[in-house]
Curated annotation (Swiss-Prot):
GO MF term list: flavin adenine dinucleotide binding
Designated gene of the protein: mnmG
Protein name as it appears in the record: tRNA uridine 5-carboxymethylaminomethyl modification enzyme MnmG
GO biological process terms on file: tRNA methylation; tRNA wobble uridine modification
Keyword Cytoplasm attached: yes
Required cofactor(s): FAD
Described function: NAD-binding protein involved in the addition of a carboxymethylaminomethyl (cmnm) group at the wobble position (U34) of certain tRNAs, forming tRNA-cmnm(5)s(2)U34.
Protein's organism: Clostridium kluyveri (strain ATCC 8527 / DSM 555 / NBRC 12016 / NCIMB 10680 / K1)
A Pfam family hit: SAM_GIDA_C
InterPro entries linked to this entry: FAD/NAD-bd_sf (IPR036188), GIDA_C_N (IPR049312), MnmG (IPR004416), MnmG-rel (IPR002218), MnmG-rel_CS (IPR020595), MnmG_C (IPR026904), MnmG_C_subdom (IPR047001), MnmG_C_subdom_sf (IPR044920)
Recorded superkingdom: Bacteria
Length: 628
């Protein structure tokens, strides 16, 4: 029996990493928001790796934080180890990564949601989406018959839609980690004309700490200097736990090869597509037959648990094969399983059905975020969640949508790739996907995005004031060192020689001196005795801006060229069949994706530079005729 329950501005379906950011963004922007989850104990849960960040992913977390999101604050409060990756390389690829206490991460996120003004949290299963006569969303129906009216919906269902767990020849309907699957909602999406596909992902076994011989492994402690994810976090000095590096052996390869016919990945049981950059251990053995061993990282899942995550050994092999295989890994000879590894297949959508706002083209007011859109990873999900939540709120308020360009943020790259190019496999963010890596660094996320977040009403006054203080400190110090001249005195020349730097021929500003490859802002402190006391993050920003000024300037010039095409908008009512000279493939792709700008159109696979020229001529002609 159906009954009317309540009325909301925004309803978020799912409370994983995408759902949490979407719900918080909408509520913090003043919309009455309902977050639905099938299990209140699964909020912000980490069903796979127990960490946040990593290469490129750390950039995403910083960007979420700069916009006023929660992920960075949450991991800063609950991490058990912190490391900055890629420090031997340039600042563009430095990426922060933190091990999380999984239980505490989820618990704190739930607490934040429960305390959030404008946000209601309910345990219920949504089985249907209702639309009105104009094709706009108007509500959702739950399994228990409750009807909730709404203006907008954010779908963030993760791997729950028709989830199916596979372990060898055993398979059963399930969500991740034993949670219930959502088996009814997919049909509602199909009824709305939304294209559904199947992807798969997997996770390794969890093993008992007491059965692991760490003496055979290489300890990997956290960094002594802890760098926070959130620009709001301070004083994060705390005791950290270690991770451990170990390796597979010849016997690992032998066990897998002898049982490869029992692998659902290779015997045809799994037909869906998995993540390219997170292959299972059996997939790695088959794909790299000449590699003698593979790295395995042993990672704690929390401070108060014996569960260890075996990173690098994701598998869907039968349980007996998993145990035999794991016991061939160095240090795991007597390992005991606490949870078996598995693969999980799930329904998701073709992201080409989405606008850059993450709203479905076919259904007004319906937004998609996270693994539903074909991505993989907590950080990718949260990035889409905050954008979907922002745009759902802006739609309710009747305001212009919020779209991050590729030159604004990695989040912009992620979403543009999904909605413009689509993906045939779970999409993972990487620094190599961005054309503008040097200006999209993790250290300057606040300088790029916090102003935007404040204008749309998501960034708080407290955060904004802190951002202005940091920005002012950086600008003031840059100005100071530009006006601080170092003269070629004897002691200066001797000091520079001691650093392996050539002598000065004439006076030079400290700002210019920093640009020498062998020097930096920190090394030159002895030439700058009146240097003010500054936070380390401010000093690092000053160093990067000074040292890489030429490269940054060149990239900013490229961005200006890029924006010329990005700002040439294509009318929604354009008739591509009317454009003579477009190739058939280009016509079909443009009609399907319906790009919002020439820039987006130029990135569509199958649309050539010649097609773009034809399109530009057509738009210019129509502009002159004032018909569009």
């Amino acid at each position: 029996m159906e009954y009317f329950s309540e009325r909301y501005d925004v309803i978020v379906i799912g409370a994983g990493h995408a759902g949490c950011e979407a719900g918080l963004a909408a509520a913090r922007m003043g919309c009455r928001t309902l977050m639905c989850t099938m299990n209140l104990d699964s909020i912000g849960f980490m069903p796979c790796n127990p960490n946040i960040g990593g290469t490129a992913k750390g950039h995403l977390v910083r960007e979420i934080d700069a916009l006023g999101g929660e992920m960075g604050v949450n991991i800063d409060a609950t991490f058990i180890q912190s490391r900055m990756l890629n420090t031997s390389k340039g600042p563009a690829v430095h990426s922060l990564r933190a091990q999380a206490d999984k239980r505490n991460y989820s618990g704190r996120m739930k607490s934040v949601l429960e305390r959030q003004h404008n946000l209601d949290l309910k345990q219920l299963e949504v089985v249907g989406i209702r639309i009105d006569n104009e094709g706009k969303v108007c509500g959702v129906i739950t399994k228990n018959g409750a009807y909730f009216e709404t203006k907008t919906i954010v779908l963030s269902t993760g791997t729950y839609l028709k989830g199916k767990v596979i372990i060898g020849d055993v398979s059963y309907s399930s969500g991740p980690n034993g949670f219930m699957p959502a088996n009814d909602l997919s049909q509602s999406l199909l009824d709305l004309g939304i294209e559904i596909r199947r992807f798969k992902t997997g996770t390794p076994a969890r093993v008992n700490r007491r059965s692991v011989d760490f003496s055979k492994m290489i300890e990997q402690p956290g960094d002594k200097r802890i760098v926070p994810f959130s620009f709001m976090s301070e004083n994060l000095d705390r005791k950290q736990v270690s991770c451990y590096l170990t390796y597979t052996t010849e016997n690992t390869t032998k066990v897998i090869r002898e049982n490869i016919n029992r692998s659902p990945l290779f015997n045809g049981s799994i037909k869906s597509v998995g993540p390219r950059y997170c292959p299972s251990i059996e997939d790695k053995i088959v794909r790299f037959p000449n590699k003698e061993n593979h790295q395995i990282f042993i990672e704690p899942e929390g401070e108060d648990t014996n569960e260890l995550y075996v990173d690098g050994a994701s598998t869907s092999m039968p349980e007996d094969v998993q145990i035999a295989m794991y016991r061939t890994i160095i240090g795991l000879e007597n390992v005991e399983f606490l949870r078996t590894g598995y693969a999980i297949e799930y329904d998701c959508i073709n992201p080409l059905q989405l606008r850059p706002t993450l709203e479905f083209k076919k259904v007004e007011g319906l937004f998609g975020a996270g693994q539903l859109n074909g991505s993989s990873g907590y950080e990718e999900a949260a990035s889409q969640g905050i954008i979907a939540g922002i745009n759902a709120a802006l739609k309710v308020k009747g305001k212009e949508p919020f779209i991050l360009k590729r030159s604004d943020a990695y989040i912009g790259v992620l979403i543009d790739d999904l909605v413009t190019k689509g993906t045939e496999e779970p999409y993972r963010m990487m620094t190599s996907r961005s054309e503008y890596r040097l200006i999209l660094r993790q250290d300057n996320a606040d300088l790029r995005l916090t102003e935007m977040g404040y204008k749309i009403g998501l960034v708080t006054k407290e955060r904004y004031d802190k951002y202005l203080e940091r920005k002012n400190s950086i600008e003031t110090e840059i100005k100071r060192i530009k006006n601080l001249y170092i003269t070629p005195k004897k002691e200066v020349i001797e000091f520079l020689n001691s650093l392996g730097s050539s002598e000065l021929k004439k006076s030079i500003s400290l700002y210019e001196l920093i640009k020498r490859p062998e020097l930096d802002y920190f090394k030159l402190q002895l030439l700058d005795m009146d240097r003010p006391e500054l936070n380390e993050d401010v000093q690092e920003e000053v160093n990067i801006i000074s040292k890489y000024e030429g490269y940054i300037k060149k990239q900013l010039e490229q961005v200006q060229q890029f924006k010329k095409f990005e700002n040439k908008f294509i009318p929604e009512n354009i008739d591509y069949d009317e454009i003579k000279g477009l190739r058939i493939e280009a016509n079909q792709k443009l009609k399907k994706i319906r790009p919002i700008s020439i820039g987006q159109a130029s990135r569509i696979s199958g649309v050539s530079p010649a097609d773009i020229s034809v399109l530009l001529v057509y738009l210019e002609k129509k502009h002159r005729e004032k018909l569009l």
